């Protein structure tokens, strides 16, 4: 099984914190996510607040962090929401993504689907241990 993230790209509407004026949209989204849950493929999913509520941490070549508060100008590069699924193949991920309800009816929108790195699911304690080991190795390398 491979985990995929279905990313709904932001629009001017989502960045303004507005929702489409479609009374059935929420019901369609909920029904679709419920169907994925019943099929055993849904791991998580949520909409995101506009980028005005977020921040970015930029690192220079020396590893110094600089925080930039939103909003961010390039709406087409932002994510408005995500759904995380666990499916046997790319074709299965594509099949689910194609059935995703149009998140912003009447507006063009893009959904991007990408596999997560690391195809093996680990228990949380093992995942945490591996992350700590990787961070320690990075620190040792400088």
Label the model's feature ranges.
Residues 1-142:
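Conserved, structured core segments of small domains
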């Amino acid at each position: 099984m491979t985990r995929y993230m279905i990313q709904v790209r932001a629009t001017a509407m989502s960045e303004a914190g507005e929702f489409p004026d479609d009374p059935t949209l929420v019901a369609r989204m909920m029904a679709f996510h419920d169907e994925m849950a019943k099929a055993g493929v849904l791991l998580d999913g949520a909409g995101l607040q506009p980028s005005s509520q977020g921040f970015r941490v930029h690192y220079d070549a020396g590893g110094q962090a600089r925080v930039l508060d939103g909003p961010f100008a390039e709406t087409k590069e932002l994510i408005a929401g995500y759904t995380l699924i666990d499916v046997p193949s790319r074709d299965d991920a594509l099949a689910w993504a194609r059935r995703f309800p149009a998140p912003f009816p009447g507006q063009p929108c893009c959904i991007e689907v990408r596999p997560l790195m690391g195809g093996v699911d680990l228990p949380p304690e093992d995942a945490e241990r591996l992350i700590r080991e990787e961070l320690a190795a990075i620190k040792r390398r400088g």
